[in-house]
Amino acid sequence: MFQVRDYSLLSFFYFMSTSTIITAAGKNSRMRKDQLSRGIELTNKLILPFNNKTVIETTIDNALSLNIDECIVVLGHYANEIKDAIFENYKDKVKFIENDPVDVGLSVSLYNGLSNSTSDFALCITADQPTVTAETFRNMIEVSQSSEDPYNTISILRRRKTGWLDTAEGLGMPFVAPRENLMRYLENENDNLNPILRKIFDDGYKFYGIKEKNEKELLNINHYDDYLKLLD
């Protein structure tokens, strides 16, 4: 199993440029529904407090700590609300782009982010993954870029098995992929990511499942109860 033993080795692999794409463009519909049913003030899940910051700020900071080439945040629904909360703190560190139109699938958001980058590889993250640590992201990058064929390899946070995978079922972000190759699969798609990842797998790409550092790394914040679990 791949695992980073010496992070100084990463500098060897960074001749292949890497960007981070963070998607923050969703409808927030399940969280809003839960907040309404509980009589809680409506607040976008990405700007809920977490570890003395907000959810999205924690995710961004984890990505920035990797010192990779660039960080791009893709906004869509509630773009103004999110930017009002975080823009001043990140305007010099992050490139913000906005979907137009906003009512598009996750694949479009990711494509728009990738198309605004010039890197060789992309670390693709959703903004509601603040518990995925920089260590896990580093493992993904190291596995991707030290593999025998980096441009035919995707390293991804595991959902079931770890190591080399025999299926892409159930997989999603975060993952590291060759940027231009991934864009070819996303172009003209308006869908969730798993069907596209399955197509990539069927075309012969090798997928490597990275083990989580702890259980919370596998938790996305879709419902209010998910958010409460993160605070435990």
Where do the PLM segments sit?
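Conserved N-terminal catalytic core of the sugar/cofactor nucleotidyltransferase
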Residues: F2-V4, F12-F13, V55-F121, E135, ...
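N-terminal nucleotide-binding beta1-loop-alpha1 segment
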Residues: M16-I40
